Amino acid sequence: MVKTAHVYGNGPSRVLYNEHTPKDNELIVGCNLIEPGINPDVIAVIDSQPIAWMHDNNVYPTAKFWVSNRSMLQLRHYEMLDRIKVNKVWDDIHRYNCGIYAVRECLNQGYNVHMWGFDSMFSDSLESPAMDKIIARHRR
């Protein structure tokens, strides 16, 4: 049986996922802060800002977490490891974004991967509409 993972990115086209009805055996992976209505099995985080936001807003999702070393340091700093279920810790890789980490992990686990909201792969769009409303970007 083919295993399917849906990686929900942050780009504008992520809304196309709203038309998909996930099957019980599909893995849903969200990147960073997940907007309401998306219920991921796994949340992938590689930066410190989403962890700080969760801490500051008392938001502790019940999904498993795949995190980078940088995010793990932030989880320890905020003493969140008793509230966040970390399932996988990745080495920090320069120029990788959260979506790349998540897709790579799914492929390494043998999943057929469907990507939603990965606009920057196919265009010059670097927008992350949902994330940008929550965490201001200082470099764009």
Language-model features and meaning:
Residues 1-140:
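Metal-ion/cofactor- or nucleotide/acyl-coenzyme-handling active-site neighborhoods
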